[in-house]
Amino acid sequence: MFLNHTITALSSGMASLVAPIPLLATVEAENSPIVMSGVLLSLVVIYIASKIGAEVALKFDFPPVLGELVAGVIIGISALHLIVFPGSGLSASDSGIMTVLQSINHLSPAALTSVFESQSEVISVLAELGVIILLFEIGLESDLKQLKQVGIQATVVACVGVAVPFAAGTAGLMIIFHTAAIPAIFAGAALTATSIGITSKVLSDLGQLNSKEGQIIVGAAVIDDVLGIIVLAVVASLAKTGEIDVVNVIYLIVSATIFLLGSILLGGIFDKTFSAVVIQLKTRGNIIIPAFIFAYFMAFLGNAIHLEAILGAFAAGLVLDESDARNDLDEMVKPIADLFVPIFFVTVGARADLGVLNPTVPDNRAGLLIAVFLIVVAILGKIVTGWVVFGQPGINRLAIGVGMIPRGEVGLVFAGIGSASGVLDKPLEVSIIIMVILTTFLAPPFLRIAFGDTVVPPATGELSSEKIV
């Protein structure tokens, strides 16, 4: 109601200046309740799909996030067309949500298109907010003390696990498939991430979380996440300019690194301030509101210095992870993430047009080859990391390499941002999503095979305090 009154008041105030504007504003004011209806109905569909998908995935012992992604594919452009977006090749009349609104409100074609675009924009903004909250949550779950203890072995594994897939993926796409530089770099960057959550769960199930291999894998995965976020911030910024300038690339890498490290170093000072503020506040939200003020401000700073909001959100999570209120904050963020993060994952799936990889269409075969190439590089590029471990005779190198394979949610962040920015064409976008799905599905059985007869009864899940060097 407030929005309606505001739009109407603005249109009345401008009437004496420009005649057509009040009419346009009046039309928009009339459509705003319908836009809200479209947003609400879209959220109903997204939440139902995400919950069903997550529950089915969990039933088969797969990460819920993959269920949310597949649910998005089903309700999106690839199947049911319930949630579609402008630029996908479908119009407002193809959207199931818009069909319902049309039948209720009898909209003209022009009004239907206007509502469709406005509703899609709102859902896209909510999805972007979801990924910011996701990276904030990942930052909160990343233990800086563990980062300091992982030692040189995990650091080397992480660096190689980022460099090899990135270089091989980017070079292969440009040389073999003649992909343009920036899309190739973006796809190569999507190969760098490792999902610590998936790997940790499998290691815990196998009783290998406290083993030397387990400590190296988990430590490397944590560092891998940090490096991956820096890479994402850099390549996403490159996508905005549309060109590769060496000076700009150096600036982005240096500024992203300084921003992240600077935030961590200043974290000790801010932790005390944050704790003092929390103690002084007596009303509801005394912990979560200051935390999100900090997270959103850091996200704003990330954007302001021409990086990415997600880098700022991730840095905020790392900083607050050291605060006295960490445990309370972890629990408070979860329900907020539960509301917004599924919107991101479902919309990533909804935007993915799997039809571009239909093998019966000759023009799609190049896209299929790209998907196969990315999957091979994604697997081999991580497996080689096991052979860079030194000074550890008898260590299971294959298990270390396989443990770095799953991409999980961070890989989907690459796909989502690449799609939203327009830097990825449909075949490349879908190839990245399929790569993420397959590597995440394949990693658990591969890891069980790699450990073979060395499996021991599940441990408590706590990491040993012994430093691997």
Region annotations inferred by a language model:
Residues F2-V469:
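Transmembrane helical cores of multi-pass secondary ion antiporters/exchangers
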